[in-house]
């Protein structure tokens, strides 16, 4: 917890009135309890209460003024504005993005910022989470994430019910001129893509089939690389042509490994076609991010049923993930993010400095990776 920006956090709490009228379990203590649950894989409020009570003599050193009761923690998760935790996560994300500025996971040399945009669905029980409708028989929330591919740090996260269509998230983004936004075809909306072009941003996505467009120009290609065609096109459809009245670049690419043929659309006319294909391939990194946090953090089983409690738990999980990434970078650790998480999970009650605890554990042999554990970009 020593790396949490507590001064900034105090301002956030004051802004949202988080500690107004609070006698026990301040917002800072609430975050410590929820982060403890993430680091040590606690599955319920009772689990948190019992685990902390078993170490009652060490609670003060962890920042707790008194024992944590599950009823008090439940009330806090239900009533305190979830935006406290989203704002804290935003502060941590800004810090982490600066630390990972030069750590690109792209397979190409590119000066531009590259983002991967996608969503992941977390299924819920409709009778318990009626505020998050998805299908007729079940509920769900969606985790919409814009991942900065320089270090796999989320630059934007939005939590919605399961019915929100992915394409609507494009309206929420603050577009960065010169940046690339890599998306699957679920985000294909020509009016919104044209807004990206007007904002000076670039996109790489896949075309839907069939696509009504006429060829304007064809560039020479080397089919041995997998590039079948590289064309500039204009949309023919009555409505689509009005929504996107400029040239689009359409690249037909055959993946030499899988044999699949993919059609990419982009508004960048100068990059080599193979680079565009490599950028789209990098979109898989956001899928790895979702798999990692679902496997290693507590966001599949919730400790409260209300919208506020669920968002509180998810945002605390995101903040914990980013904190671990910050620890790894600031201490210049060579271990994976999962290894750092393992070490922190067994040393949360230790009074030694965090850097000493991590360095001491890593000086020994790394714990063996289990076969079903994901390594996220060597994190």
Regions found by a protein language model. Give the residues of each.
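Single, function-defining residue in the core of a domain
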Residues: 1-47, 51, 80, 87-88, ...
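Glycine-rich loop/turn
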Residues: 54-60, 169-170
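A short structural micro-motif
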Residues: 55-58, 95, 299
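Juxtamembrane membrane-interface segments at transmembrane alpha-helix termini
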Residues: 59-62, 350-352
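Major-groove recognition helix of helix-turn-helix-like DNA-binding domains
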Residues: 61-80
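Short Lys/Arg-enriched helix C-cap and helix-to-coil transition segments
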Residues: 84-96
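Extended Lys/Arg-rich, glycine-bearing segments that form polyanion-binding/interaction patches
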Residues: 92-93, 99-106
């Amino acid at each position: 917890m020593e790396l949490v920006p507590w001064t900034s956090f105090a301002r956030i709490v004051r802004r949202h009135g988080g500690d107004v009228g609070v006698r026990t379990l301040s917002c800072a203590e609430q975050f410590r309890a929820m982060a403890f649950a993430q680091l040590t894989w606690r599955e319920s409020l009772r689990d948190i209460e019992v685990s902390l009570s078993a170490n009652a003599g060490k609670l003060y050193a962890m920042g707790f003024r008194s024992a944590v009761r599950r009823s008090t923690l439940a009330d806090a998760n239900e009533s305190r504005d979830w935006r406290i935790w989203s704002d804290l996560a935003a502060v941590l994300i800004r810090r982490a993005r600066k630390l990972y500025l030069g750590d690109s996971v792209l397979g190409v040399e590119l000066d531009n910022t590259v983002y991967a945009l996608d969503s992941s669905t977390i299924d819920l029980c409709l009778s318990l989470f009626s505020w998050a409708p998805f299908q007729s028989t079940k509920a769900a929330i969606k985790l919409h994430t814009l991942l900065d591919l320089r270090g796999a740090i989320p630059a934007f996260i939005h939590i919605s019910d399961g019915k929100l269509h992915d394409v609507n998230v494009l309206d929420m983004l603050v577009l960065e001129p010169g940046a690339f936004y890599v998306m699957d075809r679920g985000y294909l909306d020509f009016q919104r893509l044209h807004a990206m072009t007007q904002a000076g941003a670039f996109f790489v996505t896949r075309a839907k089939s069939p696509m009504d467009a006429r060829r304007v120009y064809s560039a020479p290609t080397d089919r041995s690389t997998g590039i079948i065609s590289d064309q500039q096109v204009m949309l023919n459809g009555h409505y689509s042509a009005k929504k996107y009245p400029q040239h689009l670049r359409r690249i037909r690419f055959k993946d030499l490994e899988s044999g699949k043929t993919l059609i990419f659309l982009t508004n960048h006319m100068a990059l080599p076609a193979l680079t565009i294909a490599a950028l789209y391939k990098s979109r898989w990194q956001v899928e790895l991010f979702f798999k990692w946090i679902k496997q290693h953090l507590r966001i599949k089983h919730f400790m409260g049923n209300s919208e506020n409690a669920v968002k509180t738990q998810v945002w605390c999980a995101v903040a914990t993930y980013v904190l671990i990434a910050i620890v790894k970078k600031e201490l210049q650790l060579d271990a994976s993010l999962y290894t750092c998480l393992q070490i922190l999970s067994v040393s949360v009650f230790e009074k030694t400095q965090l850097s000493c605890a991590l360095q001491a554990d890593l000086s020994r042999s790394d714990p063996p990776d289990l076969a079903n554990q994901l390594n996220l970009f060597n994190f």
